[in-house]
Design a protein with these regions (language model features):
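A short Gly-Trp-Pro
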Residues: 1-105
Length: 105
């Protein structure tokens, strides 16, 4: 992770709702590196690929597969130091803003 995210997104699209992910967003050019192999699922509208661990199935990140999307998402729930403190979300003890995203269409 290149830096602490400013916020994490709680998306209400069909797959994020079901998986319970909270994504930390970074610019596509941020140089995010994922260690180890992942399996991928190409989401319904074929704009992003959602990656998950082939062993345990945890969603790890998503990345764009079309031009024009300038960010990537990392599953914040997998970050060391990430905790949920009641209605607050924390990363290494510091509060993170959660924005509720209406992407259900």
């Amino acid at each position: 992770m290149p830096s602490r995210p400013e916020w994490v997104g709680s998306c209400n699209c069909s797959i994020c709702r079901r998986l319970g992910t909270l994504f930390a967003y970074y610019p596509a050019e941020a140089g995010i590196r994922i260690e180890g192999e992942t399996a991928r699922y190409v989401w319904g509208d074929r704009m992003i690929s959602l990656h998950h661990c082939p062993t345990c199935g945890c969603p790890t990140h998503w990345e764009p597969i079309v031009e024009g999307i300038d960010k990537v998402g990392i599953n914040a729930r997998l970050l060391d130091g990430f905790a949920i403190d009641g209605p607050r979300y924390l990363l290494n003890g510091d509060e993170l803003e959660v924005r509720y995203l209406d992407n259900a269409g």
